[in-house]
Amino acid sequence: MILCVFLLVVIGLFSVQTTLLEVFSLWGTTPDLALIFAVYCGAHFQRNGGIGAGIIIGFVQDCLSGGLLGINTLSKGLAGLFFSVLKDKIVVEGFIPISFFIFTASLLDGMIYFVISTSLTAAQAKEGILLIRMFAFGIYNSAAGLLLFYLLDKGRQWINHKIPNQVLRPL
């Protein structure tokens, strides 16, 4: 049951990200719903479930992107690992912590993408433009992350209310 809910959310997020979010592009930047969901899984899944969820989300995104295989798997897996470890030490709830942590994860994701793509391919990027775009990416992800965290929390509460047994409690 947990796997079915997880798959439905992942399919929905990738559908929205690939079809609808291009309309809301700012300076060529769109929010990365997969990264936000990896952070959410790391912060809310029990034990180390966020690591596996981040790796699966990143691998699916790598397969759908057609670019270098492994960049998203690494970055989303690291986001899941970071927040799986961090959730026991810091409460990841509220406006400011969620925004800060998603912004940090976005910068980490952008740096991983930049380092791997420039070292493995002949891609070149201007550092000034890259820094501005990464900063815009982080701010845009933070804003979208607040909305997505809210929607995912409401969905989790609704599922736990409708199915009051212990089947979905690890979510």
Language-model-derived ranges and their functions:
Residues 1-171:
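Terminal, non-globular segments
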